[in-house]
Design a protein with these regions (language model features):
Chain A
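N-terminal secretory/membrane targeting signals
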Residues: 1-25
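Non-transmembrane, membrane-proximal soluble domains of secreted or membrane proteins
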Residues: 25-48, 69-279
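Hydrophobic single transmembrane helices highlighted by the model
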Residues: 42-62
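Alpha-helical transmembrane segments
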Residues: 57-73
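Extracytoplasmic/periplasmic beta-strand context in beta-sandwich domains
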Residues: 190, 236-239, 305, 331, ...
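Detector for the c-type heme attachment site
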Residues: 226-230, 293-299, 325, 350-354
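Flexible coil segments in periplasmic/lumen-exposed cytochrome c-class electron-transfer proteins
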Residues: 256-277, 282, 286-287, 335-374
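Sequence/structural segment immediately N-terminal to covalent heme-attachment motifs in c-type
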Residues: 274-300, 308-326
Length: 374, 534
């Protein structure tokens, strides 16, 4: 499998453009299958230009090959010194612009059509999702429901073959509905892109961009951040689960119920034991923090600080709470105050202070976070 | 004043010796040589960075460099190849050849010529420091932005970005001065009888290149200065929270960045305009249309910059305008390809190394042209944008379009510069080696891009492994071939068969060809009395 793919890749490289015209679709030599009307239109446009490009290249290569075979000195061919003064030589310069303009207008005509579809925001959307890029994860807010999903990359151990293309919490969307995405960012530029269902628009801090789609087929669709956004640019994948509208409604109801229960739990006055917090914290740490600080807490030397025996994780509790809540300006450390609730934050901090030999024995309570937030 | 001394001495080939010959040089040939040597050094530094990038991408996972160092290498590879390699090499050729071609004794502004060159090593040191400063603790995040240095990311970066901004300032001053010098020389220093429409195409290409640089370089300098102010002096030109606009920087950058592409391409097109007639032994086909359409390309190139930003969310009307403008670029480019092919038509072709490069350029640059039209189509570009498809496209445009054109120029003029013929057999081996390995490197990248691999990622999913391995193997071969290039150059400089004044049989066909009437190597001062142009 892999070997044949490799051979194909070599062949593709050597045969230059001729292959590009014929070997579409299989073996990832082309775009993945589009599953929305707009991406289908873009795919068709891509195929049209690819075909025109292939034809042009065949013609150019053909003429050049003919010239090189026919008009060589070694065959005794003598140069025609007056060729450029002939009628052809005098007037041919009008030929190319006319032909090329014709091709250009053909392409531009069909492109303008698709472009108007892309920019058509007149129809009402059934689902509106605000997509927020931040270093280095995606947050999805369903504007009509009180649902918020934070989507982090899955570590290699869990993602397997989909590593760098798999996340813990995918965006769930219904099929057959008009979906509107609002793109923005919290820190630097990002670009949200899932080629099969929706094209790119940049996420720009302080601005909102809009795209839309209508997914025709259930499935899991993957993509990656397309605009360079710093250290973790390669590590912020995108996954969309497209499900039937019924399943989507059920998922939404469950999501709302769980969120309500979690909120209630976090705001209760219960005092938690260290072990309870540690157990909750481990899972939360692995999904939210291990992208940078690593599962074993060692970080990445020179890029992300380790937490094993670190001053923050073993020193003053308030300082630890402060950096997790508010982030650290000028570094990649994000502010988590708005992303996790008090109980979750308390659990993560407790975990960090007791895992990997950081045996401080501290149990940070949700109440501590509540007071620190003030 | 020097001229007076020379005349009394009757010794036109007297040249200063020692370091002063180079440091204080006002001689267009010596400055040209220094530009070319500088470009060669930078080619190896930028190439070494490319080798590190491809070595990292050979396998998925993080093997050789960390993500920040990787992105810094990507940034500096681009800047060094553009500002350190292609532009100085083209400027070196302009310095060497333009005065000889138009019958001028030297450049119009020889002292400024000296300064434009000597700013370059300073700029290169700043640029390399911006890469190395990350190894000193406390200097902040490395330059992990890519060469486009888009804010807000470039505001997060540490000290490296300041060094880079100062380097860009110096590079800009250097290019503007060099361009003013070249344009002035072309307008004022032509020998009697050398009308504009008799100038070799290379001179015309540099005329437009110089004008482009004079127009766009100040915009880049302004843009990066605003960035510097945002970073340190509390302004918010590019910060939405302070009423600024991050996209404004992209417009400023690409107003420079797109014409910059033609700055890189045009001199090489000029070289083709000499090489192809020479080895086809017949005059350039359609000289006048080529000049006019070069002017058209120059004008059009200035007003299509935003096709690099289709995804930033511009209005339908603006996007449509930039799409159609961009697609129209295929007209001048198409005409150039057409005219070069028909220069060969009914010619008497031989296949020396410069000609082999020229033919390869026609084919591969056409290919870059058709993928360029694909990319210009906005709806499709919303899928291609920022993937390896784009990386493949612009390497096809810039390596054949600019770099191979310079190689063709080096092989074409080395006999003139040194007085020795290069080893034709080694030249041909170098041609086949680079051309094949270049295609092996970049052709697969079209497919990894279509399959969804974004640019500038240090690690990739295993589905892209085959394409990346082929690409890396090709890149190593491509890199290695340049050692042969270096060997050929050193060998030719040191000795070899006498070249004679006109080493190429067809060199003077269809052009005044003044440069070929001088001996090889030409004397230190080419002309003491204006040459005659028929």
């Amino acid at each position: 499998m892999s070997k044949s793919k490799m051979i194909l890749a070599v062949l593709a490289s050597l045969l230059l453009t001729t292959l590009a015209g014929t070997a579409y679709a299989d073996y990832a030599l082309n775009f993945p299958e589009p599953v929305a009307p707009l991406t289908q239109q873009m795919y068709d446009l891509h195929m049209l230009t690819t075909k025109i490009a292939t034809i042009i290249m065949v013609i150019v290569i053909g003429i050049v090959a003919f010239v090189l075979i026919k008009f060589r000195k070694s065959k005794g061919y003598e140069a025609d010194q007056n060729f450029h003064k002939s009628t052809f030589g005098t007037w041919s310069w009008t030929l190319v612009p006319i032909i090329v303009l014709g091709i250009d207008l053909t392409i531009a005509g069909s492109a303008t059509d698709a472009l108007q579809q892309v920019e058509d925001y007149s129809q009402k959307a059934d689902v509106t999702v605000k997509v927020i890029g931040s270093q280095w994860k995606w947050t999805y807010e369903y504007m009509d429901d009180d649902i918020r999903i934070v989507s982090n990359m899955l570590p290699k151990e869990e993602a397997g073959d989909n590593y760098l293309r798999a996340v813990d919490n995918p965006l769930v969307l219904p099929t057959g509905k008009r979906i509107r995405f609002l793109h923005t960012a919290s820190d630097v530029l990002h670009a949200w892109w899932v080629p099969q269902i929706v094209y790119k628009k940049d996420s720009i801090p302080g601005y909102i961009n809009e795209t839309w789609t209508n997914i025709q087929k259930e499935g899991t669709y993957r993509g990656q951040c397309a605009e360079i956004c710093g250290t973790g640019h390669a590590f912020m994948p995108i996954v969309v689960e497209a499900v039937s509208p019924e399943k989507y409604e059920a998922w939404k109801a469950e999501k709302l119920m769980v969120a309500e229960a979690a909120a209630a739990e976090a705001s209760s006055d219960k005092t938690w034991t260290k072990d309870e917090l540690y157990a909750r914290g481990e899972g939360l740490y692995n999904t939210n923090c291990s992208g940078c600080h690593q599962v074993n807490g060692t970080g990445m030397p020179g890029v992300f600080p380790g937490l094993v025996g670190s001053k923050i994780a073993t020193g003053d509790i308030d300082a630890h709470i402060n950096i997790v809540l508010n982030g650290k300006a000028g570094t990649a450390m994000a502010a988590w105050a708005a992303q996790l609730n008090d109980l979750e934050l308390a659990a993560v901090i407790t975990y960090e202070r007791n895992a990997w030999g950081n045996n401080t024995g501290d149990a940070v309570q949700p109440a501590d976070l509540k007071s620190a937030r003030k | 004043m020097n001229a007076v001394i020379h005349e009394t001495d009757h010794h036109h080939d007297h040249k200063p010796t020692g370091y002063k010959r180079w440091l204080y040089s006002t001689n267009h040939k010596d400055i040209g040589t220094m530009y070319l040597v500088f470009a060669l050094v930078m080619l190896f530094i930028g190439g070494a960075m490319a080798m590190l990038i491809r070595a990292e991408l050979y396998m998925p996972g993080l093997q050789i460099v960390n993500p920040d160092l990787y992105n810094n290498l990507v940034t500096d590879h681009a800047l060094i190849m553009i500002f350190g390699m292609v532009m100085p090499a083209a400027a070196g050729m302009a310095n060497w050849m333009i005065p000889m071609m138009i019958g001028a004794p030297d450049m119009a502004l020889p002292r400024m010529n000296n300064m434009s060159f000597w700013l370059l090593p300073a700029a290169a040191i700043l640029l390399l420091s911006s890469l190395l400063v990350q190894f000193i603790p406390g200097t902040g995040v490395p330059v992990n932005t890519g060469w486009t240095i888009y804010p807000p990311l470039s505001v997060q970066v540490g000290m490296g970005m300041d060094l880079l901004i100062f380097s860009v300032h110096l590079l800009g001053i250097s290019s503007i001065m060099a361009s003013i010098n070249i344009v002035t020389t072309i307008l004022n220093m032509r020998a009697p009888g050398m009308t504009m429409m008799k100038m070799p195409l290379f001179v015309w290409s540099w005329f437009f290149t110089g004008l482009l640089l004079i127009i766009v370089m100040p915009v880049l300098a302004g843009g990066v200065t605003m960035l510097l102010f945002d970073r340190h002096f509390g302004t918010s030109f590019f910060d939405a929270a302070g009423g600024g606009d991050p996209i404004l920087f992209q417009h400023l950058f690409w107003f420079f960045g797109h014409p910059e592409v033609y700055v890189l391409l045009l001199p090489s097109i000029g070289v083709l305009g000499l090489v192809i007639p020479t080895f086809s032994r017949k005059p350039l086909f359609g000289y006048k249309p080529l000049v006019y359409f070069m002017g058209f390309l120059f004008a059009l190139g200035l007003v299509v910059w935003a096709h690099h930003q289709y995804t930033v969310g511009m209005s339908l009307a603006v996007t449509t305008y930039f799409m159609i403008g961009t697609i129209l670029i295929s007209i001048p480019i198409g005409l150039m390809i057409f005219n070069f092919i028909f220069t060969m038509w009914r010619g008497s072709i031989t296949f020396e190394t410069p000609m082999l490069f020229a033919i390869a350029i026609i084919l591969m640059f056409s290919f870059a042209g058709v993928t360029g039209v694909m990319l210009a189509v906005v709806p499709a570009d919303l899928q291609y944008h920022d993937t390896y498809f784009v990386v493949a496209h612009f390497h096809y445009a810039l390596i054949p379009g600019a770099v191979f054109g310079l190689y063709a120029g080096v092989f074409y003029w080395l006999p003139k510069w040194t007085g020795h013929m290069y080893d034709e057999k080694l030249g041909k081996i170098f041609f086949w080696w680079t051309t094949l390995s270049f295609n092996l490197t970049f052709f697969p990248q079209h497919f990894s891009g279509l399959a969804g691999m974004p640019r500038r990622i240090v690690d990739y999913n295993i589905q892209y492994i085959e394409f990346n391995q082929v690409s890396s193997i090709g890149a190593f071969a491509f890199g290695l071939s340049h050692l042969l290039f270096l060997y050929i150059i050193i060998q030719t400089v040191r000795g070899g068969k006498e070249a004679g004044a006109k080493p190429w049989e067809g060199a003077q066909i269809g052009t005044p060809g003044l440069e070929w009437s001088l001996p090889s190597p030409p004397p230190f001062h080419s002309y003491t009395t204006p040459p005659e142009v028929k």
